[in-house]
Amino acid sequence: MKAQGETEESEKLSKMSSLLERLHAKFNQNRPWSETIKLVRQVMEKRVVMSSGGHQHLVSCLETLQKALKVTSLPAMTDRLESIARQNGLGSHLSASGTECYITSDMFYVEVQLDPAGQLCDVKVAHHGENPVSCPELVQQLREKNFDEFSKHLKGLVNLYNLPGDNKLKTKMYLALQSLEQDLSKMAIMYWKATNAGPLDKILHGSVGYLTPRSGGHLMNLKYYVSPSDLLDDKTASPIILHENNVSRSLGMNASVTIEGTSAVYKLPIAPLIMGSHPVDNKWTPSFSSITSANSVDLPACFFLKFPQPIPVSRAFVQKLQNCTGIPLFETQPTYAPLYELITQFELSKDPDPIPLNHNMRFYAALPGQQHCYFLNKDAPLPDGRSLQGTLVSKITFQHPGRVPLILNLIRHQVAYNTLIGSCVKRTILKEDSPGLLQFEVCPLSESRFSVSFQHPVNDSLVCVVMDVQDSTHVSCKLYKGLSDALICTDDFIAKVVQRCMSIPVTMRAIRRKAETIQADTPALSLIAETVEDMVKKNLPPASSPGYGMTTGNNPMSGTTTPTNTFPGGPITTLFNMSMSIKDRHESVGHGEDFSKVSQNPILTSLLQITGNGGSTIGSSPTPPHHTPPPVSSMAGNTKNHPMLMNLLKDNPAQDFSTLYGSSPLERQNSSSGSPRMEICSGSNKTKKKKSSRLPPEKPKHQTEDDFQRELFSMDVDSQNPIFDVNMTADTLDTPHITPAPSQCSTPPTTYPQPVPHPQPSIQRMVRLSSSDSIGPDVTDILSDIAEEASKLPSTSDDCPAIGTPLRDSSSSGHSQSTLFDSDVFQTNNNENPYTDPADLIADAAGSPSSDSPTNHFFHDGVDFNPDLLNSQSQSGFGEEYFDESSQSGDNDDFKGFASQALNTLGVPMLGGDNGETKFKGNNQADTVDFSIISVAGKALAPADLMEHHSGSQGPLLTTGDLGKEKTQKRVKEGNGTSNSTLSGPGLDSKPGKRSRTPSNDGKSKDKPPKRKKADTEGKSPSHSSSNRPFTPPTSTGGSKSPGSAGRSQTPPGVATPPIPKITIQIPKGTVMVGKPSSHSQYTSSGSVSSSGSKSHHSHSSSSSSSASTSGKMKSSKSEGSSSSKLSSSMYSSQGSSGSSQSKNSSQSGGKPGSSPITKHGLSSGSSSTKMKPQGKPSSLMNPSLSKPNISPSHSRPPGGSDKLASPMKPVPGTPPSSKAKSPISSGSGGSHMSGTSSSSGMKSSSGLGSSGSLSQKTPPSSNSCTASSSSFSSSGSSMSSSQNQHGSSKGKSPSRNKKPSLTAVIDKLKHGVVTSGPGGEDPLDGQMGVSTNSSSHPMSSKHNMSGGEFQGKREKSDKDKSKVSTSGSSVDSSKKTSESKNVGSTGVAKIIISKHDGGSPSIKAKVTLQKPGESSGEGLRPQMASSKNYGSPLISGSTPKHERGSPSHSKSPAYTPQNLDSESESGSSIAEKSYQNSPSSDDGIRPLPEYSTEKHKKHKKEKKKVKDKDRDRDRDKDRDKKKSHSIKPESWSKSPISSDQSLSMTSNTILSADRPSRLSPDFMIGEEDDDLMDVALIGN
C-alpha cells in the first residue's frame, strides 16, 4: 500500500515538473512587442465594453445622490452645476479662484458667479459675439435651488442653436430671431400705448397677445387666448384677477417665437423692420420697412410660432393659415380626422388622469340643479356632405413679423370654437338613467358654427340653438323653436351668456332657467297655447314652412359676419325678411293662416287676449312664451269685439309673427321651424330671393291679404314691441343694453342693421352682441345689471324682452311688449339695464344673486373675460364704439331720465298736453319731446357707431342721451323729414355740423344742431328719444305695427294694451339733427302732438301729445290736443282742432326761434296731420288714419308744415310733390293708414312743409326735403300704424276711410316691397330695412342722414335748393344733393329704439347702418330715404291724387306712376328715391313743395283738417274710450312725441317705405308695394 501511494505521488510531481518546464520553455521565448501591444489593446477594449452598462448605472446613481444632497457649500454648488452641464451635453469649468463656474458651448456660455460660501451672486448669459448679460430668471432659479428649471433653461439655450450650418450661419439666424423679437415687442408696446389695455385685453385683443420676452432659455412667449374657465382658481373656484405681475406662463393658450432650420431657403430680416413708434391704422398696424438685401438674408431657416400642445384645427383653418402666411403649414400632407374627436382628445389630455375615459363621444356635466348629457356628433354631415375634419397643428411658419397678428386672430377664432366644444368634454360620470338627466346633441354646421339641440323646457318639442363663433370674442346665437312653442329666451341673452362663460353646459343651464322664469311669469301660457292650437289646429303651417324658414338666412348665422352687416341683416334685413317671411309663409302655408296670424301677429295676440295684455301678447307666437300660444282668453268674444281681430284672423296671410318679427332673431328663429342647418345653408340669399319672389306674387295673390298684412303690420307695430325687435335681431329689444354697440357685431352686430343689401340673419345676432358690447358696461356689469333688471323685469313676464329685442326676440311679442311698455322696465334699468332678459339669463349663467347659475361658478362678475370679449375691439367694429360714441355722452343720463320720462312722454305726456309736456320737459325738457330726431344722437358717430349707439343706447333712455343729439339730428332730419329724422338722414352722415342742420331753414338748421346738443345735455332729448322711439316701430317692420301700430293693436282690444313701445331712431352724429335741444324738443313735442292729434294712431297721439307738450307752442296746442287725444284718440281730436292751430303755430313756430323748426314741425306736423286728414284724398287713401291723418311723423311735421303743406300741397299737386306730396301725405296720413303711408310721403312733404313748414319755412328745400322725408316716413309709418291701431280697435274692420284697406295695403306693400327689395345685393338689405319698420325708418334715417349729413354741408345748399325747389324740385334735389354730398360721410347708423308705454326699458329695435349716399345711397341710404319718402309719397299720391308730384315718390303706387324726378313732389319718397339715385332735381322737388306748396297745403290741409278733425274727433272719442286704457301706450309713444308720431308714421311709413324704398331706390323693390298700397289706399278712398 505504501509503495503504491508513493508511486502516485511521484507521478504527480513528474507531471507538475513537466508542466513547469513547458511553461518555462514557452515564456522564455522572445515575443515581439507588436503582439504584446495587440494583446493589451484587446484586453482594454473588452474591458470598456463590459463596463459601459455599469458606468451608466453608476452615473445615474451619482446624480441621484447629488439631487438628494443639500447644496450648502461652494464645492457642492460647483459639483451640481457641472453635473447639470454634463446632462445637457455642455462643457463646464471653474475659474482659478473657484468662485466662477462656466457652462459652455460653441454658441454661448453661462457664467455663474458664487461667493466663497457657495451663495449665488449672479448668473450671466453671453451669446456668440456678445457681452454677458445678467439673467434675473436664472438668478431666481438658482437662488431657490431650483436646479430642474435651471436645467430646462440650459436645454432651451441648446435648442435655440440647434440649427443647420456652421457657427457663422447660426449667428445670422440668431440675429434674425433677435430682430423679429424686437419688432414684436414694439408692436406690443404700440397696442398698449394706444389702448392702455390690461393683461386680459392684451391677451384677447392685443395685436401680438400678451408678450413675454425671451429670458434665459425660455423663448419669447405670446399668450393669445384665455377662457373664462382659465380665469378661475382650480382650488378655490374664485376668479383670478389678472395684473401685470401675476400672468403665469402656463395660463391660457400660448405660442413661443423661435427660428428653426428648414429644407427650403427663406429671406429673413436680420434687422428690425418697424419704423416709428405709432401705428398706421386703428388695428395698431405698425409701419414696416420693405425687405431688402440690406436688412435681410437668405437662410435655410424660418420663423415659427410653436405651441406647447398641438392644437386641433379644421381643414378650412389650415387653408386660411396657408393663405395668410403664404407658406405650407405642413411639409407632408397631414392626416385628417373628425375635428370633434381631436378636440375631445385635446381636452382630455389636459387632465393628468391616466385612466382612459370610455366616452364614445358622450359626456356628462353636473351643474347646480341640473345634470346634462352631451353627445358630440363628430360625423354629422356638413352642407357639402362631408363631416367636419381637422388635424393637429404644433407650429406655424411665417417670414414677416407683420403676419403674427393675423395668425393670432385666426388661432384665437379656432381656439374659441374649440373652447366651446371642449366645454362639453368632462370626465364626469353619471348614470344614463339618472332622473332629470337632460340630453343635448352638439352637431357641427361649419368650421365656425354648430348647433345644440335639446327638448323644449316647456313643450314636448325640439329646440335648437345655433352658435356662430364669429371671432374669438363674438359668438352670435340663434334659437330655433316651433311656432307654437313657449318662449325660452332671447338670442341676445344666449349670446351674452355664451360670451360670458364660453361654456355650452353653463349656457344650456342658463337657457333652461330663463325659460322656467318666463313660464313662472306667464302662468296662462299653457292655456293660451291650447287655445291657439285649437284655433289653428286645422291649418297649422308646417314647421318647416318657408315662412318659418323665412327667418331668411338673416337670422341664421349666414350673412355677413361683420357687426355692421349683421345689423343690417338683423333689423333691416330682418324686417324685410319678416315681411317677406310673412309673404313666404303665406305662399308656402296656405292654411296656417289662422295660426300664423295668431302666432305672428302681436296685435292679433293682444286682441285675442283682450286683456290688453298686449305686452305678453305682443311677441310673435314663436317669440313669446305668452304669445307662444296666442292668448286665448276669450277668443270668440275678442274676435267679435274687435273688427281688427276679425280682419287679422280673416285675411291675414299666414304670416308667422315670428316671421313678421322675424327680424328679431329670436322671434324669427323661434318662428322659423327650418333647421338651423337649412337656414344657414339657405343663407340670406335664399331668403331674399324667396321674399322677392314671394312678395310680388303676394300682392296679386292676396289683395285682401296685402291689406290685411298691412293692417297687421301696423297692428303688429302697435301691439308688439317685439316687432321692433324684429328689425334688430330677435334680441334687439334687449340689445339696447345687450348691444355692445354687433355691436358689435358688428356684429353684429347689433340691431343696428345697416341698410346693407344682404340680409344676414346670423349677423343680426352678432349685431346684437356688438350691441351688447357697445352698451358699454362690461359683460360682467351688464350681466349683473341684467340680473338686477331681470329680477325687476321678470314680472313683465318677459324673458329678457324688457328693453330690447328680448321682447320680440324672446318670441313673446306680447311679453316683450309688456316689458317694453312697462314703465317699470324702462324705469327700472332704463339707463343701463335694458336687457332684462339677458340680465336674467346672465343672472342664471353668471350666478346672479337669485340664480345658482354656474356662471357665477365659472366666472364671477369679477371675471373680465366676457366683458372684455364683449367690449373687445375685435367686436367686428360695432362694439363699444357704437355704444360709447352714441350713448356715452348724454345717452345714459337721458336714458335714465327717460325711463320714467319715456313712460310719461310716451304714455302720460302724450295723453295730456300739459302733462306730457311737463313730463317731457321734466324728464327730457323740451328736447325730450323731440323724440323723432333724438335717435340721431348729437355725436358724430359713424353710421355703424350710430347704430351701435342706438343699439347701445339702452332704450329710449339711452336714446334720450342720443336724443338730445338726435333731437338736433332729428331737427336736421326734420329739416330732412321729422319722422325720418329719427333715422336722421343727416345723422347718417355722422357729421356733427351737418347733423346740426335742422328741419328749420338753413339758418335754423345750423342753429338747431346746437339745440340738439343742448337737448342732449338738458336731458330732454331722452324724451325725444322716446318720441323718436316711436320711429322705431318702423324697426319692427315685420311687425309693421310700429308703436303706433302697436298702440293700435292694443287699442283694438279696447283695453289699455301694453304701452305702445316708443321707437326712437338714433342716427349717427352725421345724422341731421336740427334745432337746439329745447327747440328740437319743442319740435318733437309738436310732432308728438300731431301724433297724438292723430287719434288714429294711439302711439301717434301719444307721441303728438308729448311732442306738443314739449314744444312751447305745441305745448298749449298739445295740452289741448294732447289731453283731448291723450289716448291718442283724444290727442288726435284735439290735434284736429288744435292741430290746425298747431299747424299754424307750427308754421309760425317755424319762423319763431322759440318754436324752433322742430317745434314748428311738431306743431306743423300735428296741424298737418289734422290738415292732412282734411285733405280728404290723402286721408282717404290712408283711410284708417281718418282720425289720425298724420301719423306721428305726419303729425310731427304736419303741424306747422301741415299748414304749409296743406296749402302747398294743394297748390302743388303738379308742383314738386315734395311739399305737396308731403302735405298730402300728411293729410293722407291723418286720413288713414294708407293716408299714413301717403302721409309719410306727404309727411315728407308735410314734414318738409310741416317740419320745413315751420322749419321748412326756414329750410324748406333741403331741410324740408329731409325732414319731410323723415317726417313723412315717420308720419306715414306712424299714421299707418296708429291708424291701423285705431282702426284695429275702433275701426278694426275697415274704416269708412279705407283705413284698413290703406293699412293693409301699406302692410302688404311693405311686405311686398320688402320682398321685392331684393333687386341688388345691397338692395335686399335696404329693402329689408325698408320692410322692417326699422328698416324703413333707417332708410329714412339714412337718407335723412345723408340729407342731414349732407345737409350740414348741403344744408345751405338745401336752403338754396329750397328756394329752388319751391318752384322746381329743389327739395328732392337738395335731398339728393345731401345724399350725394353726404356720400362721403353719409354712412351712419340709424337706431330705432322702441320704448314701452309703461316706460319699460327702451328697446332698440333695429340699428341701421346708413351707407354713404353716394355709395349706398342708392342701395342703402336711398332705400332708406326712399323708404321714408317713398312711403310718404305714395301715401300722398294715394292720399291726394291731385298731388301727382307727390306721387312720384309713389311712382310705385298705381295712382302715381311717376317716379321721375319731376315727381319731386314725392318729396320724401321722391327725394328718397332720387337722392338714392343721386338725382338732384328730385331733392329739389321735395323742397319746392315745402316752399310754395306750404301755403296752399296749409289751406288745403286746413280744410281737410277741419273735415278730418271732425272725423278725428269722432275717432278720437272712440279711441279715447277704447284707448283710455291704452292711454298709457299712447303716452309711451308720447314719450317720444315726435318719435312716437314719427315712429308711428314711421312704422306705417317704414312698412310702406320699405316697399317704397325699393321703388325709390332700384334696390328696393318695395316700390311695387307702395304702388299697391297707393292703389289700395286710393281705391279704399
Curated annotation (Swiss-Prot):
<dbReference type="GO" id="GO:0097067">
    <property type="term" value="P:cellular response to thyroid hormone stimulus"/>
</dbReference>
<dbReference type="GO" id="GO:0035357">
    <property type="term" value="P:peroxisome proliferator activated receptor signaling pathway"/>
</dbReference>
<feature type="compositionally biased region" description="Basic and acidic residues">
    <location>
        <begin position="963"/>
        <end position="974"/>
    </location>
</feature>
<dbReference type="GO" id="GO:0005634">
    <property type="term" value="C:nucleus"/>
</dbReference>
<dbReference type="GO" id="GO:0035162">
    <property type="term" value="P:embryonic hemopoiesis"/>
</dbReference>
<dbReference type="GO" id="GO:0000122">
    <property type="term" value="P:negative regulation of transcription by RNA polymerase II"/>
</dbReference>
<dbReference type="GO" id="GO:0060750">
    <property type="term" value="P:epithelial cell proliferation involved in mammary gland duct elongation"/>
</dbReference>
<feature type="region of interest" description="Disordered">
    <location>
        <begin position="609"/>
        <end position="705"/>
    </location>
</feature>
<dbReference type="GO" id="GO:0030518">
    <property type="term" value="P:nuclear receptor-mediated steroid hormone signaling pathway"/>
</dbReference>
<keyword id="KW-0010">Activator</keyword>
<feature type="modified residue" description="Phosphoserine">
    <location>
        <position position="1482"/>
    </location>
</feature>
<feature type="short sequence motif" description="LXXLL motif 1">
    <location>
        <begin position="604"/>
        <end position="608"/>
    </location>
</feature>
<dbReference type="GO" id="GO:0070847">
    <property type="term" value="C:core mediator complex"/>
</dbReference>
<dbReference type="GO" id="GO:0030331">
    <property type="term" value="F:nuclear estrogen receptor binding"/>
</dbReference>
<feature type="modified residue" description="Phosphoserine">
    <location>
        <position position="953"/>
    </location>
</feature>
<dbReference type="GO" id="GO:0045944">
    <property type="term" value="P:positive regulation of transcription by RNA polymerase II"/>
</dbReference>
<comment type="subunit">
    <text>Component of the Mediator complex, which is composed of MED1, MED4, MED6, MED7, MED8, MED9, MED10, MED11, MED12, MED13, MED13L, MED14, MED15, MED16, MED17, MED18, MED19, MED20, MED21, MED22, MED23, MED24, MED25, MED26, MED27, MED29, MED30, MED31, CCNC, CDK8 and CDC2L6/CDK11. The MED12, MED13, CCNC and CDK8 subunits form a distinct module termed the CDK8 module. Mediator containing the CDK8 module is less active than Mediator lacking this module in supporting transcriptional activation.</text>
</comment>
<feature type="modified residue" description="Phosphoserine">
    <location>
        <position position="1156"/>
    </location>
</feature>
<protein>
    <recommendedName>
        <fullName>Mediator of RNA polymerase II transcription subunit 1</fullName>
    </recommendedName>
</protein>
<feature type="compositionally biased region" description="Low complexity">
    <location>
        <begin position="1101"/>
        <end position="1156"/>
    </location>
</feature>
<dbReference type="GO" id="GO:0031100">
    <property type="term" value="P:animal organ regeneration"/>
</dbReference>
<dbReference type="GO" id="GO:0060261">
    <property type="term" value="P:positive regulation of transcription initiation by RNA polymerase II"/>
</dbReference>
<dbReference type="GO" id="GO:0048821">
    <property type="term" value="P:erythrocyte development"/>
</dbReference>
<feature type="compositionally biased region" description="Low complexity">
    <location>
        <begin position="1078"/>
        <end position="1094"/>
    </location>
</feature>
<dbReference type="GO" id="GO:0000978">
    <property type="term" value="F:RNA polymerase II cis-regulatory region sequence-specific DNA binding"/>
</dbReference>
<dbReference type="GO" id="GO:0045893">
    <property type="term" value="P:positive regulation of DNA-templated transcription"/>
</dbReference>
<feature type="modified residue" description="Phosphothreonine">
    <location>
        <position position="805"/>
    </location>
</feature>
<feature type="compositionally biased region" description="Polar residues">
    <location>
        <begin position="1425"/>
        <end position="1440"/>
    </location>
</feature>
<feature type="region of interest" description="Interaction with the Mediator complex">
    <location>
        <begin position="108"/>
        <end position="212"/>
    </location>
</feature>
<keyword id="KW-0539">Nucleus</keyword>
<dbReference type="GO" id="GO:0043066">
    <property type="term" value="P:negative regulation of apoptotic process"/>
</dbReference>
<dbReference type="GO" id="GO:0030224">
    <property type="term" value="P:monocyte differentiation"/>
</dbReference>
<feature type="modified residue" description="Phosphothreonine">
    <location>
        <position position="1440"/>
    </location>
</feature>
<dbReference type="Pfam" id="PF10744">
    <property type="entry name" value="Med1"/>
</dbReference>
<dbReference type="GO" id="GO:0046966">
    <property type="term" value="F:nuclear thyroid hormone receptor binding"/>
</dbReference>
<dbReference type="GO" id="GO:0000785">
    <property type="term" value="C:chromatin"/>
</dbReference>
<dbReference type="GO" id="GO:0032968">
    <property type="term" value="P:positive regulation of transcription elongation by RNA polymerase II"/>
</dbReference>
<feature type="modified residue" description="Phosphoserine">
    <location>
        <position position="1403"/>
    </location>
</feature>
<dbReference type="GO" id="GO:0050693">
    <property type="term" value="F:LBD domain binding"/>
</dbReference>
<feature type="compositionally biased region" description="Polar residues">
    <location>
        <begin position="1162"/>
        <end position="1195"/>
    </location>
</feature>
<feature type="region of interest" description="Interaction with ESR1">
    <location>
        <begin position="16"/>
        <end position="590"/>
    </location>
</feature>
<dbReference type="GO" id="GO:0003713">
    <property type="term" value="F:transcription coactivator activity"/>
</dbReference>
